[in-house]
Amino acid sequence: LDDIRARTQTSKSQLFHYFPDGKEQLLLAVAEHEAKMVLDDQQPYLGALTSWAAWQRWRDAVVDRYRRQGQNCPLAVLMSEIGRTTPGAQAVTSALMRKWHDEIATGVRHMQTQDKVAAGLDADRVAAALLAGIQGGVGVMLATGDLGYLEAALDVGIESLRNEG
């Protein structure tokens, strides 16, 4: 907290006015902001998965985000500082995953209405699989620096969806 006070030139009383529960509350606020940035960095593509070209633009935005970020994941650092199993950290992570999942599922459903994807596909399962692939690819990238796993997860996931059309 002393580092934050020094960088923001705020007093301890100001800091505790906005974050009365202290460090964890402050870190959760920053984690919520970082989680929002994960989705914002994918817009407008994530919110407009209406064609195969749009899916490719979204894929490229996801890969670009993690290429720029590299092995320094602000959200992962914050969560490790807070503790991944605390109720606050789980709420931030759950909200991020739910919003991300819902955006992908909406894109799948849109493609179904255009008869570009089989109507019988479960859009929620497809979204869950794509999101799990992204998370796995990001995990490998954070551990090794290799972005290829993320690219493969997205490419194979989108291509599989496309072949269901």
Segments (PLM) and residue ranges:
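Amphipathic alpha-helical segments used for helix-helix packing
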Residues: 27, 54, 67-88
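Short, basic, alpha-helical segments at the C-terminal edge of helix-turn-helix-like DNA-binding modules
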Residues: 31-38
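Helix-turn-helix
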Residues: 1-29
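Hydrophobic alpha-helical connector segments
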Residues: 40-71, 123-130
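Hydrophobic alpha-helical bundle segments that form small-molecule/ligand-binding pockets
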Residues: 85-87, 98-126, 161-165
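Conserved terminal C-lobe alpha helix of the protein kinase catalytic domain
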Residues: 60, 94, 98-101, 105, ...
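Amphipathic C-terminal alpha-helical segment
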Residues: 65-68, 110, 130-148, 160-165
